[in-house]
Amino acid sequence: MKPAERRKARHLALQAIYQWQLAKDNVADIVEQFKLEQPTKGVDLPYFELLLTGVVNNVTNLDATFSPFLSRKLDDLDQIDKGVLRLACYELTYCKDVPYKVVINEAIELAKAFATDDSHKFVNGVLDKVVKQMGLRQ
């Protein structure tokens, strides 16, 4: 799969995760809605579905992965930041074919595209600690 197709899948997945976080809609319904309403040309759709369902099905474990490194309570975290961290922690934990540096870079780019001005710095700092804790840094 081309990196650009995965990048687009991450963009869509973050938007879908955001929707799920706010509305708690059924994941299958969100997937269908996104396929109908979002431009999916050049998107790795199976990867999009994997990321969305993976985050939703593992949200408690993912939150436990990054929560110790937050400077505030999880409930006080911006929804986009929370979605980016959940998505990145899912990839770090379950998508072993994706190098951790790629995961962090993609998370930073998502934060720059969708979140507040300094969110990318916050996301980078948290994920740096997660990677260290997971023993992924060489």
Swiss-Prot record:
<dbReference type="InterPro" id="IPR035926">
    <property type="entry name" value="NusB-like_sf"/>
</dbReference>
<keyword id="KW-0804">Transcription</keyword>
<comment type="similarity">
    <text>Belongs to the NusB family.</text>
</comment>
<dbReference type="InterPro" id="IPR011605">
    <property type="entry name" value="NusB_fam"/>
</dbReference>
<comment type="function">
    <text>Involved in transcription antitermination. Required for transcription of ribosomal RNA (rRNA) genes. Binds specifically to the boxA antiterminator sequence of the ribosomal RNA (rrn) operons.</text>
</comment>
<keyword id="KW-0694">RNA-binding</keyword>
<keyword id="KW-0805">Transcription regulation</keyword>
<dbReference type="GO" id="GO:0003723">
    <property type="term" value="F:RNA binding"/>
</dbReference>
<dbReference type="Pfam" id="PF01029">
    <property type="entry name" value="NusB"/>
</dbReference>
<protein>
    <recommendedName>
        <fullName>Transcription antitermination protein NusB</fullName>
    </recommendedName>
</protein>
<keyword id="KW-0889">Transcription antitermination</keyword>
<dbReference type="GO" id="GO:0031564">
    <property type="term" value="P:transcription antitermination"/>
</dbReference>
<dbReference type="InterPro" id="IPR006027">
    <property type="entry name" value="NusB_RsmB_TIM44"/>
</dbReference>
<dbReference type="GO" id="GO:0006353">
    <property type="term" value="P:DNA-templated transcription termination"/>
</dbReference>
<dbReference type="GO" id="GO:0005829">
    <property type="term" value="C:cytosol"/>
</dbReference>
